[in-house]
């Protein structure tokens, strides 16, 4: 006769005993959902790490000192995915754990080994980026190939020392039947819990924040110098253009005045000469009526000459108006140049700082930043350092935030659960879905590392795109020519392609 269970208990199918609802194992649906999500995370992590590792191995020039650390990070992630994750997926099935407690202890130690190796490598990368930016001249002598390999070996030695205490009795691991996974009994050894949390989160996070804070300050100062130099060069160019436009305007004005004076003198001289010639010809005509006729001819000739003179003056006036118009346009352009000089349009690039592999690359791109015309002249003409545009600070802060926040997101909940287990019974107080989410986030770091430390780097990103194109996009076979006997003809100049050989379409259609 099976025991009857109350509302606060439920019968366990395996042991046929009544268990509190707070200690019941996860349901089959819960286990399936956990396993499916884990498989998706592990698949993406495996693909991302393999592609990035292939790119680094394919291009030897990319395997510099820093990229060796990144390659070591990929190795730790791949080992975590290949050796640890399959057992975590299998234990997500309720009432299924085929091995004994000793294997569970070994599995927890192996999980911590790869996790500590990954954390130590991230710390080394942060220090390496600090030395690269702050001490660029002495960096090659400080970070030699020999020292880089010593650091790589040191990450694994330190990880081994940090993860193996449960194997020789300091700290205990067991299989959690309620949450269906192997875990440490953190409350049984508070000292090991404190050491693990400090090694996992406190020290690495402190080193990362310190290094990237100094790197951000140095990058901001260098960008300010670049920004100031660009603004000074732009002001000099604007002043030169204004002076040049003023000189051209004065030159055109002088030419216009000289041309008007010359045209006025030339028109008056021609009128006097032609009038005197008409007076000399008039006495040769008969006296009396002939004189009258000559007088009329004189008036007529004078009228004609006056008409010509007025036409020339009119033409000269029209040319003068054109010159005046050009001069006014040049003056307006010069005034615009003065306004631009006061406004000082400076461009500061959005991609000035690029933290690929936590590295800073300064480009010469610029994004418009306008000093308002309503600002006081003392500010517009000030020689002090111009303020950095907010887009630059947001860009740098955003990238550093991605690096640090992803680290805290993946390992922070796991460390918080370890600390909480010292004072609280997590088997009964922490919901099972919270434990599942913490497991997902712990393995999510294997997906994040290839993106943060690989894809964000410009050169590595380009190589990854080329590799993906070769894997995904198949090359289409070349289209064979349907008229193999046709020859190329020289295109004439009328076609606008002089000197190039192009297939003749007319030869294909002609009989």
UniProtKB/Swiss-Prot annotation:
Composition-biased stretches (Polar residues): 376-385
Subcellular location: Cell membrane
This protein's UniProt keywords: Cell membrane, Disulfide bond, G-protein coupled receptor, Glycoprotein, Membrane, Receptor, Transducer, Transmembrane, Transmembrane helix
Tissues showing expression: Expressed in the brain in hypothalamus.
Pfam families the record matches: 7tm_1 (PF00001)
Residue ranges that the UniProt entry lists as topological domain Extracellular: 1-35, 91-106, 171-196, 420-432
Annotated glycan sites: 7, 13
InterPro entries: GPCR_Rhodpsn (IPR000276), GPCR_Rhodpsn_7TM (IPR017452)
UniProt cross-references to SUPFAM superfamilies, sorted A to Z: Family A G protein-coupled receptor-like (SSF81321)
Comp. bias regions, Basic and acidic residues: 240-261, 477-490
Cytoplasmic topological segments: 57-67, 128-149, 218-398, 454-511
Any one of the GO CC terms: plasma membrane
Database matches in Gene3D superfamilies: Rhodopsin 7-helix transmembrane proteins (1.20.1070.10)
Segments traversing the membrane: 36-56, 68-90, 107-127, 150-170, 197-217, 399-419, 433-453
Record-level Gene Ontology MF annotations: G protein-coupled receptor activity
Coiled coil: none
Ranges where the record places region Disordered: 240-315, 367-386, 476-511
Bilayer disposition of the protein: Multi-pass membrane protein
Predominant location category: membrane
Disulfides per UniProt: 104-182
UniProt similarity note: Belongs to the G-protein coupled receptor 1 family.
PANTHER family to which the protein is assigned, alphabetical: G PROTEIN-COUPLED RECEPTOR, G-PROTEIN COUPLED RECEPTOR 101-RELATED
Described purpose of this protein according to its UniProt entry: Orphan receptor.
Name used for this protein in its record: Probable G-protein coupled receptor 101
Organism for this UniProt entry: Mus musculus (Mouse)
């Amino acid at each position: 006769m099976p025991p009857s269970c109350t509302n606060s208990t439920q019968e366990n199918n395996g042991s046929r005993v009544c268990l509190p609802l707070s200690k019941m194992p996860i349901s089959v649906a819960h286990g399936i959902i956990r396993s499916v999500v884990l498989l998706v995370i592990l698949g993406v992590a495996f693909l991302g790490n393999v592609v990035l590792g292939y790119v680094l191995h394919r291009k030897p020039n990319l395997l510099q000192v820093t990229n060796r650390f990144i390659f070591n990070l990929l190795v730790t992630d791949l080992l975590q995915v290949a050796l640890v994750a399959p057992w975590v997926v299998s234990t997500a099935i309720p009432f299924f754990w085929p091995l004994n407690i000793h294997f569970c202890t070994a599995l927890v130690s192996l999980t911590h080994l790869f996790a500590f190796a990954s954390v130590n490598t991230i710390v080394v990368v942060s220090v390496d980026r600090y030395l690269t930016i702050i001490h660029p001249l002495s960096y090659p002598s400080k970070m030699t190939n020999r020292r880089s390999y010593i650091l790589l070996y040191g990450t694994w030695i330190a990880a081994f020392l940090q993860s193996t205490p449960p194997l020789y009795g300091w700290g205990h691991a067991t299989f959690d039947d309620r949450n269906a996974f192997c875990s440490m009994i953190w409350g049984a050894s508070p000292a090991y819990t404190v050491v693990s949390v400090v090694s996992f989160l406190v020290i690495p996070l402190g080193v990362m924040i310190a290094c990237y804070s100094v790197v951000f300050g140095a990058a901001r100062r260098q960008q300010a110098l670049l920004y100031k130099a660009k603004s000074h060069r732009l002001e000099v160019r604007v002043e030169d253009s204004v002076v040049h436009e003023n000189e051209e305007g004065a030159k055109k004005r002088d030419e216009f005045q000289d041309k008007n004076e010359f045209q006025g003198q030339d028109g008056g001289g021609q009128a006097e000469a032609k009038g005197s010639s008409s007076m000399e010809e008039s006495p040769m005509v008969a006296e009396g009526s002939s004189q009258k006729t000559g007088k009329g001819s004189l008036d007529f000739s004078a009228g004609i000459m006056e008409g010509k003179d007025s036409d020339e003056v009119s033409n000269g006036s029209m040319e003068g108006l054109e010159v005046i118009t050009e001069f006014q346009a040049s003056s307006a352009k010069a005034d615009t140049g003065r306004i631009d000089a006061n406004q000082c349009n400076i461009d500061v690039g959005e991609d000035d700082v690029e933290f690929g592999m936590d590295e800073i690359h300064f480009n010469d791109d610029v994004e418009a930043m306008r000093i308002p015309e309503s600002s006081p002249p003392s500010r517009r003409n000030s020689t002090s350092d111009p303020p950095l545009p907010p887009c630059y600070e947001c860009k740098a802060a955003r990238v550093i935030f991605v690096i640090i926040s992803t680290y805290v997101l993946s390992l922070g909940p796991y460390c918080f659960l370890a600390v909480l287990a010292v004072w609280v019974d997590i088997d009964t107080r922490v919901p099972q879905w919270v434990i599942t989410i913490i497991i997902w986030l712990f393995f999510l770091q294997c997906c994040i590392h290839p993106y943060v430390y690989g894809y964000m780097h410009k050169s590595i990103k380009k190589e990854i795109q080329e590799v993906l194109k070769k894997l995904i996009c198949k090359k289409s076979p070349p289209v064979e020519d349907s008229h193999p006997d046709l020859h190329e003809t020289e295109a004439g100049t009328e076609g606008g392609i002089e000197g190039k050989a192009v297939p003749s379409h007319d030869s294909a259609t002609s009989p």
